[in-house]
Each structure stands twice: as structure tokens, then as C-alpha cells.
Amino acid sequence: MIRAVTRAVRAAVRPARAAAPLASTSASARRPAGAREISALATRENILRAAIAVFAEHGFSGARVEKISTAAGSVDRMIYYYFGNKEGLFVAALEEIYRRFNAAEAGLALNEAEPVESLRAVIGFALDYYRKHPEFINLLNSENLHRGVHTARSPRLREYSSPAIGVIARLLRSGVAKGVFRADVAARDLYLLIAAAGYFYQGNRFTLSAFLGENLESPAARAHWESFVKDMVMRAIAA
């Protein structure tokens, strides 16, 4: 009799014990999913970071997928998984360097009530950014050698140009309202003037140093150029 009762109790308890791990298994399955998403994002970011460095050093044509995956501490198939192919990765790298530029510029403490000083700050920022981020110049040089075929495939680059030009447009409007800037200057033209002055100097600093017989990378030479560009821009747009 006692044995029969004991067996009945064990039979009743057994399903409950078996059911308990189901809830635990379900919860643990949810947790790794979030961890996998974080890991996937980190893998993609590592690949993109490595790609920018490798493309900057070797250009699009010279960069090899296996070199990028090795630099990222990953494997080739992950590049194809996240970016499709080397071309897709290069487009993503170009988008990323523009995104970084905009993010850095957005951190400037600009006062639209002081358009002259704020515009001078924008010019100084642009020239300094080109100097501190040679990968920006190098990737654009490589893309221009390919006649912009990769940037043409990106739907985001036009989106990234809007904030950069928008900063200048707001300062121009403020300056016009205060009577210190001409009203017939387009923000696009001013953006091109500033970008050209910074890009050309940084992108050609080695050959120009040899051609001119002076070190254009010296602090004194850079300070002189920045002062000259600021003065040139202000004279061009002064009312």
C-alpha cells in the first residue's frame, strides 16, 4: 500500500520536474538572441573599421578581402554576409567616412548670432579634420580614380551632403541678416571653396612640398595656410 502511494506521488511530481526546464530554456534562448545581435553588430563594425584602414592604405583596387578580414579578426565569408562583396564594402566605407565627418562637425559649438567667427571655426575645423583623418582623403582619392562609380551607387551620400551644406547655409543667412555677408553667395559654392582649399592642400602635400621646396606639413606652414584660407573666404563673401 505504502509503495503504491509512493509510486503515485513520484509519477505526479515527475511531469512537474520535467516541465520546469522548459521555462528556463525559453528564457535562456531569448538572452543569447540579444547577445548574438550585439556580437553581429560588433563584427560588422570591426570589418568596416578594418576596411577603411586597408582601403586607405591600398586603394580599392589594391585592397584584398582576405587582408581586410584578417585585420578585422574575422573571416572572408563574414564580409560577403554583411556587405555582399568588396564593392559593397567600399561603398559602406565611403558612407562611413562622410558620416564621421558630419558627426564631428555637429559637435562644433557654433553661434549663429556670430556668423563671422562661427564660419571661421567651420573653416578651421575642415582643414584640421583633413589633416587628422588622412583616411578621408585617401578613400576619396581612390574613388575619384574610379570616376565615382561606387559613390554613385550609394543612396546615402546625398543625405550626408545636406548637413554639411546646411551648416554653412545657416551661417550665411545670419550674416546676410546682419549685413556682414553678401546675399548672392550660395552655400554650395562656399562649401566647395572650403573643401577645395583643404582637400587640395592635404591631398597633394607631399608633391607640393617637393615642388615648392618647403615642408607643407610643418605647423607653421599649416597655420599660415589656415589663416590665408579664412581671410580669402571672408573677403569673398564680405558685404
Where are these regions (language model features)?
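All-alpha amphipathic helical-bundle segments outside canonical DNA-binding/catalytic cores
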Residues: 117, 155-160, 177-193, 224
